[in-house]
Amino acid sequence: MPAALITVASLGLPLLFVLYLRESDAFRDLPRRELALTAALGVVLGVGWALLTGAAVARSYGVPLGAGIAAERILRDGIAVPLGSMLLMLVPALVTRWSWRGEREALDGYVIGALGALTFTAAANLARLAPQFTTGMVNRVRPLDGLLVEAGVRGVAMPLTAAGVGGLIGTALWFTRPPTKVHQHRVFVRAILVVIAVVVVAIYALLGVVDVARLPQLVQLALHLTLTGIALFALRVGLHLALLHEVQDDMHADEPILCGECNH
């Protein structure tokens, strides 16, 4: 991949997410120390994981999509590596949850989980694709359609899937039930958590199998985008349930609603 495409594909969505946090005043509501800790852990773990597993996924990242690898390596390169990546991707959210002080809200967990997953994915992609920076701004060897498909997978599908999974797990870690509902629907809540865990594991296992399978490029892109849609749908359902059943803020109906821009 050309250097410019690598940079945009790796950093595009993380930068958009940071801009989203800024515009939604998340930096005002969330401790900046926790945000910095989450991002730093994601970068360190992403680079370390990329260096550790570079040989195992070299063909997946260093040659055109669809080239495939030997069938006997599917279990290791197609399942073990993606699942290990998923577990490490969640470490920033787990560490931040352990060090968290103060009240917990599901939306805070979503932000922390998605931020950790996006920084992990971006750092891992940059570390793995760094040798390809030598191709310069233009790559005259790879066909354009192959570059666009790879950019769609590395720059759109993978980070969106990571953000969906990380945000979902973060939401679960920060979810707090009100005292009046602690013992209500306990079986239902546990069943939802089990389903979420199964969906997350299945998504990342399937992503790895898709990467190592000998499939046409457009088919791989379509499968990646399908799994991304499933991850985002699971995030939507999980976040909706968490917001409905978590501890609600005190209501002050008699207070005026102020403009967010001028405070009047």
Q: Which positions does each model-derived feature cover?
A:
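Hydrophobic alpha-helical segments at protein termini of multi-pass membrane proteins
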Residues: 1-264
